[in-house]
């Protein structure tokens, strides 16, 4: 798994691309200690990996020494020195938290690295003011598409005049004034063995939390059935996404044990407060195990790629709840609630003008999980990373 290497416009690497990355005078100087370093000076020490999958980083310049990390294709590294090692030249590199040796043949450097870095680096803008207007065109007199929140960050697609062109979601692109943003470029970087273990542990933890939450939901439904004398037919809920990924394609009426049959809008009938709470917890935990999976326009696969409504549709389908396919269908089919009253497991909707074009799942703590765009994939954002226009519930 790759890690991102962040460059705050100017900083430890101080890279200034010809695309217009700018260091502003009102930024904190402590973040930019070497702002005068040129692109040419820095790229003489930068390498970009060119490998089929990944190569190991070694403690010494030979293949029998201890592995200290791994680096994937198109990752950036700083070359600290070139040494003679087993089979020829090796670089001593630093990338992320990893320092070690790797054969020079696996990297490109100099002008070739500079050109490639400009294509593989991902630039982001972080809003540093409240209620920043996203405009349709790079002009202060242009129509406002939505309002962005302080601290949220967005993919930068380009620069026009004193505006950044940003991709908020795959379905929303607009312009923001540069003076209200701080930008940075991120590259993939090497990972240590400990970081690799930690990543796998976090993935397994999310899967286990989903399995535990679903088991708790089933237990709550069984207890309710016993207490109420209901002999409900249990619908199996799969916590394993590989087994359940296509479940949202089923068209049969849903039955959730402890609830009545799903209504035409997909909402289950009355259930106990305990079952409702467990359902919300399970939906959120189930959704979070797909964090980092790809965004694919028109996609409905929770593992291989989904768009915003394909993601929410698939999550709810795993619990026998039919939402509809598009964000507009889901906004219409759910029971509308106040945005201020949203709870974990409810849906928030976003629009361009009067046209709903994005949906996200509220997970609590002022955050949503959603399939945003091809750069970020399925990600967690502040609920007001753009202004929500509607909220609905499919749960009560």
Where does each model-flagged region fall?
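Aromatic- and glycine-rich peptidoglycan recognition patches
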Residues: 2, 7-11, 15, 20-29, ...
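SH3/SH3-like beta-barrel superfamily modules
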Residues: 67-104, 146-179, 255
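Catalytic cysteine-centered active-site loop
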Residues: 291-344
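Extracytoplasmic/periplasmic cell wall- or extracellular glycan-interacting regions that localize
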Residues: 116-117, 223-293, 297-310, 314
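Short alpha-helix capping/helix-loop boundary micro-motifs
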Residues: 61-66, 138-143, 330-337
């Amino acid at each position: 798994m790759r890690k991102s290497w962040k460059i705050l416009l100017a900083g430890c690497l101080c890279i200034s691309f010809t695309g217009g990355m700018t260091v502003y005078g009102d930024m904190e100087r402590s973040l930019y200690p070497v702002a005068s370093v040129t692109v040419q000076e820095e790229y003489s020490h930068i390498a970009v990996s060119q490998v089929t999958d990944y190569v190991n980083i070694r403690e010494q310049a030979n293949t029998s020494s201890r592995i200290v990390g791994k680096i994937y294709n198109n990752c950036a590294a700083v070359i600290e020195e070139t040494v003679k090692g087993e089979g020829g030249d090796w670089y001593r590199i630093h990338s992320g938290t990893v320092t070690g040796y790797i054969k020079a043949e696996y990297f490109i450097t100099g002008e070739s690295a500079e050109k490639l870095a400009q294509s593989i680096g991902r630039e982001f803008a972080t809003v540093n003011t409240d209620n920043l207007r996203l405009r349709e065109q790079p002009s202060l007199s242009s129509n406002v598409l939505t309002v962005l929140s302080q601290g949220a960050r967005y993919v930068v697609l380009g620069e026009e005049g004193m505006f950044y062109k940003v991709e908020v979601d795959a379905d929303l692109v607009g312009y923001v004034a540069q003076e209200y943003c701080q930008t940075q470029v991120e590259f993939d970087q090497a990972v240590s063995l400990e970081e690799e273990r930690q990543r796998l542990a976090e993935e397994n933890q999310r899967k286990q939390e989903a399995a535990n939450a679903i088991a708790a939901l089933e237990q709550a439904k069984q207890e309710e059935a016993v207490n109420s004398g209901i002999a409900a037919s249990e619908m199996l809920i799969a916590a394993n996404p590989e087994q359940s990924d296509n479940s949202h394609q089923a068209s049969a009426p849903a039955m959730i044990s402890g609830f009545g049959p799903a209504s035409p809008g997909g909402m289950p009938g009355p259930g106990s407060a305990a079952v409702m709470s467990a359902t919300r917890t399970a939906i959120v935990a189930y959704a979070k195990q797909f964090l980092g999976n790809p965004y694919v326009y028109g996609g409905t696969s929770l593992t291989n790629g989904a768009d915003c409504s394909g993601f929410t549709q698939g999550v709810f389908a795993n619990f026998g709840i039919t939402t509809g396919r598009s964000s507009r269908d889901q906004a219409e089919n759910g029971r509308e609630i106040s945005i201020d009253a949203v709870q974990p497991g409810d849906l928030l909707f976003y629009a361009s003008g009067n046209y709903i074009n994005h949906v996200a799942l509220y997970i609590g703590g002022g955050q949503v999980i959603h399939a945003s765009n091809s750069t970020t994939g399925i990600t967690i954002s502040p609920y007001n990373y753009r202004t929500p226009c509607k909220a609905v519930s499919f749960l009560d």
